Amino acid sequence: AAPIQYFFRQNATATRLVSIDIGGGTTDVAFAKDGDLQHVTSFKFASNDLFESSLDASLRNGIIDYFKKIVENKIKDIDELKKILDSNTKPSNIASFFFSLQENPAASDLDKSVINFDSLLREDEHFKIVFIIFYTAIIYHIAQILLLMGMPMPRHISFSGNGSKVLRVITSDSKLLAKFTCKIFQLLGVEAVDGKLEILGLGVDDSSPKQATCKGAL
């Protein structure tokens, strides 16, 4: 619930807020109204599920297998980065390495546009649907909780946690994502008080997802 406090401090207009903290193994959700925490829940469906299955120990993943060849070619002349990549075998660990690559000091001389994993995924039409389904599944689950609790559509949804970085693959436009989210709520019959929804935590000017989690605890 730490991100709840942070976003209420940063957003004076926040009234009905759902905080979604996506980690590697779990997604933690908190429902709040006017700064008061009303309900919390957690479920084992998070970013790692995009890159590996909890049902088997397979080291194969279509997304990672495809992009590993591309990234390997970009960093082939940087031993430090090659060693890190070669030392990771789990697809989820490789994905974390890819997402952090452009911020790695060892990659400072590389063109950021060619090692930006967010952009590579966003521009790829084959795998984007996987991330859209991932996001839709989370929002669907939250909609079911709202219906069960008799709660209306939130005015704001805030995202935090390193796992929420994958949502930027869908779009970098928070307003577009908000429209898509509203449509899901509407289709499932969630009451809309004013029909307005704002997505927080994913914009370029917002704090990083991990920072939002940490700052809320301060």
What are the language-model segments listed below?
Residues 35-69:
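Short glycine-rich, Thr/Ser-proximal phosphate-binding strand/loop in the N-terminal lobe
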Residues 17-21:
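Short glycine-aspartate micro-motif
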Residues 24-28, 46:
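Short acidic, Gly/Ser-rich segments with clustered Asp/Glu that frequently serve as metal-coordination loops
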Residues 5-13, 31, 39, 64, ...:
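Helical "lid/coupling" subdomains associated with nucleotide-phosphate turnover
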Residues 24-25, 34, 164-165:
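Short, glycine-/Ser/Thr-/acidic-enriched flexible segments
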